[in-house]
Amino acid sequence: MATEDDGELSARYQNTLDALSSLITKRGRLASNNQSHRFRLLFHYLKVLELEDAVSQMKIIHVAGTKGKGSTCTFAESILRCYGLRTGLFTSPHLIDVRERFRLNGIEISQEKFVNYFWCCFHKLKEKTSNEVPMPTYFCFLALLAFKIFTTEQVDVVILEVGLGGRFDATNVIQKPVVCGISSLGYDHMEILGYTLAEIAAEKAGIFKSGVPAFTVAQPDEAMRVLNEKASKLEVNLQVVEPLDSSQRLGLQGEHQYLNAGLAVALCSTFLKEIGIEDKNGLDQTNGLPEKFISGLSNAYLMGRAMIVPDSELPEEIVYYLDGAHSPESMEACAIWFSKQIKQNQERNQKRSEQILLFNCMSVRDPSLLLPRLRSKCIDQGVDFKRAVFVPNVSVYNQVGSSTNVGTRVESMSWQFGLQRIWESLARGEAKSNSKSDSKGKEEEKSFVFSSLPVAVDWLRDNARQSKQVRFQVLVTGSLHLVGDLLRFIKK
């Protein structure tokens, strides 16, 4: 029966996720020779999976960067789909379900296909493991799985987002992409990539391939110098692209998306010329973008970035503004987007509103860099948070399951109390400054730590029910995991 089939598939899928979870290892900054060894193993894995020839023939757009690489890939995939190409998109991380990482023609892969492709790869690799050749780690396996899916499904173009860094990233096993892109660079994953922009840029530039054209956006001088040096050594024609004109409608919100869209346009223009679909004149932007580019840009969609979602129980009283920003620069972009949305809403809506921050970040981040950038940029734009809420993420990091329990899993709250202290310190500093210039000061801010996301959402809903005349506008940021947890919890 259909229900029994669905139940059987659901059970198989959960078993698959459990097996995938077994590949998760703790990540840290490995010695260079260890990273190099793990990277070389990827070529062995491709051979075991009999994917060497198929991968070498794939037409690939490869994108690295600190910020905006996922958005750039999303724009590029949407544009190329408008040209009738069968697309394969591999991105990370996922928010709710691991299948989000694998998209065929813009649609995440089905459970049935995912299960079948997974076990095909898993069993073949498991048969060949030894002390010298262990099973691939979690992300390496996902990249190999992407290659298996996209080659078997015979896509016309693969858009690959680098997972971390570039030089030793699992996606960099490809030898001859059609074109490469580097989105905005900044400080992130420094414990792995290095503590200077020069070191980080060198890792990202590791995706450059001899003679393969590459594009980037305007970068800090230190980073740009390294990118140019790496490109010159490999005879790569590296070009810097400008943001798209802000009159162009984009499917992804935020002013920073015009920069990502500009990079995507350059990548797609080059790709289409290289495979002979469009000639150079057909993509001359001086006469405006081709209609298919305009359509692709305006219809692009990426979950968890600049996303507005009403609460499932109290849609009129609580609205969530979701953005997975987790670097200092992306915090500023998030603040600008959020502030703009608040102002536009105030112009349209007579109901009084209150802005609330719901925040967490991973312990590898530095909240003393993130929270001040977010707060000061919002204040610059005329938006103040009346309350701030700090919670742990729900997701279990050694478990992939899309059915991750969203109950009240209690952990040590020391990290969240630390976030609260940083926030309150910022508030006290502003209060002192305001008291000197304004005798009235401003309404006292409040901050809270809750043991879990469900408890925090219940608290928000209780407050909203008691204050029907006020609309709560909740910015959820600091971690894509937190954004995914909230989406899962409110069942959106």
From Swiss-Prot:
Keyword Glycosyltransferase found: no
Gene Ontology cellular component annotations, sorted alphabetically: cytoplasm
EC number: 6.3.2.17
Main localization category: cytoplasm
Residues bound to Mg(2+) 2: 189
PROSITE patterns, sorted: FOLYLPOLYGLU_SYNT_2 (PS01012)
Keywords: Acetylation, ATP-binding, Cytoplasm, Ligase, Magnesium, Metal-binding, Nucleotide-binding, One-carbon metabolism
Modified residues (N-acetylalanine): 2
Residues annotated as binding ATP: 68-71, 305, 323
One MF annotation (Gene Ontology) recorded for this entry: tetrahydrofolylpolyglutamate synthase activity
Binding note for cofactor: A monovalent cation.
Inactivation phenotype: Vegetative phenotype does not differ visually from wild-type. No obvious defects in root development. Polyglutamylated folates still detectable. Has significantly reduced methionine levels compared to wild-type. Combined loss of FPGS3 and FPGS2 results in seedling lethality. Seedlings fail to proceed beyond the expanded cotyledon stage, exhibit an albino phenotype and are unable to thrive beyond germination. Fpgs3 and fpgs1 double mutant exhibits dwarfed leaves, late flowering (approximately 13 days after wild-type), reduced fecundity and delayed senescence.
Cofactor: a monovalent cation
Binding-site residues for Mg(2+) 1, renumbered to this chain: 92, 161
Pathway annotation from the record: Cofactor biosynthesis; tetrahydrofolylpolyglutamate biosynthesis
GO biological process: one-carbon metabolic process
Family named by the database record: Belongs to the folylpolyglutamate synthase family.
PANTHER family, A to Z: FOLYLPOLYGLUTAMATE SYNTHASE (PTHR11136:SF15), FOLYLPOLYGLUTAMATE SYNTHASE-RELATED (PTHR11136)
Function comment: Catalyzes conversion of folates to polyglutamate derivatives allowing concentration of folate compounds in the cell and the intracellular retention of these cofactors, which are important substrates for most of the folate-dependent enzymes that are involved in one-carbon transfer reactions involved in purine, pyrimidine and amino acid synthesis. Essential for organellar and whole-plant folate homeostasis.
Annotated protein name in UniProt: Folylpolyglutamate synthase
Organism per entry: Arabidopsis thaliana
